[in-house]
Amino acid sequence: MIEIKNVSKTYPNGTKGLKNIDLTIERGEFVVVVGLSGAGKSTLLRSINRLNEITDGEILIDGLSITKAKGKELRQIRQRTAMIFQSFNLVKRSSVLRNVLSGRVGYHGTLRTVLNLFPKQDVELALQALNRVNILEKAYSRASDLSGGQQQRVAIARALAQEPSVILADEPTASLDPLTTKQVMDDLKRINKEDKITTIVNLHFIDLAREYATRIIGLRAGEVVFDGPVSEATDEKFAEIYGRPIQEDELLGEELDEPASEHASQ
């Protein structure tokens, strides 16, 4: 469970990134956050795992305050809170397997991880994670040799290697084509269902949000202006969230319905 209690974020220049956010996200939910660029979507996700420091309020993950946590306790909470980025954040010169193993860094000492001395069970866990996203055959390839879709699936495998209770995905499909977008979202949704991992995803495309979410949260200028099930997320509601009618580039379109064939090759 994630509890966001009256959270605000004010930047040094006075800009309000978040305004009095109150949300409770239950274990196993698949939540999609939508809103215009600058609405606070990334700020919210980065505040949950404390990549951003909030100005007011408190955030609890599984009953533990990440806002107040320090040292070992903070590291332990972050170990269980995996982040997936739009830009993949892989070490391109390293192998796919080594990138996935970086998800285990929080469980070991610095020297051991620098020297790549991961125990056998960690290697097995990393390989299993790659298999779950259908990219096991690329384990010993350089990350730089992979397509964008393959790199994002490596990032998902890295998140899985953390054995998280929460996955935060910040625009994970923004740089991908429609077919690969569906494959990546299918992976995230399947993992959410199978492992009951609480998943929060920031998305640009409205139809994608409707297809995958169990709950949609709409942000506008740092405030929650919609929070409800997909059935209530009408075009009119999205127009309220965005402050204007839906535009064509906010819909992925019919290509979303193409069969996700050749999954591992994209």
UniProtKB/Swiss-Prot annotation:
SMART domains: AAA (SM00382). ATP binds at G35, L36, S37, G38, A39, G40, K41, S42. Its EC number is 7.3.2.2. One of its GO terms (cellular component) is plasma membrane. InterPro entries: AAA+_ATPase (IPR003593), ABC_transporter-like_ATP-bd (IPR003439), ABC_transporter-like_CS (IPR017871), ABC_transpr_PhnC (IPR012693), MetN_ABC_transporter-like (IPR050086), P-loop_NTPase (IPR027417). It is found in: Cell membrane. Its main location: membrane. Gene3D superfamilies: P-loop containing nucleotide triphosphate hydrolases. Keywords: ATP-binding, Cell membrane, Membrane, Nucleotide-binding, Phosphonate transport, Translocase, Transport. It catalyses: phosphonate(out) + ATP + H2O = phosphonate(in) + ADP + phosphate + H(+). Residues 2-246 form the ABC transporter domain. It is a peripheral membrane protein. It holds the Pfam family ABC_tran. One of its GO terms (molecular function) is ABC-type phosphonate transporter activity. It is an enzyme of class 7 (translocase). Belongs to the ABC transporter superfamily. Phosphonates importer (TC 3.A.1.9.1) family. Part of the ABC transporter complex PhnCDE involved in phosphonates import. Responsible for energy coupling to the transport system. The complex is composed of two ATP-binding proteins (PhnC), two transmembrane proteins (PhnE) and a solute-binding protein (PhnD). This is Phosphonates import ATP-binding protein PhnC. It comes from Shouchella clausii (strain KSM-K16). The lineage of its organism: Bacteria, Bacillati, Bacillota, Bacilli, Bacillales.
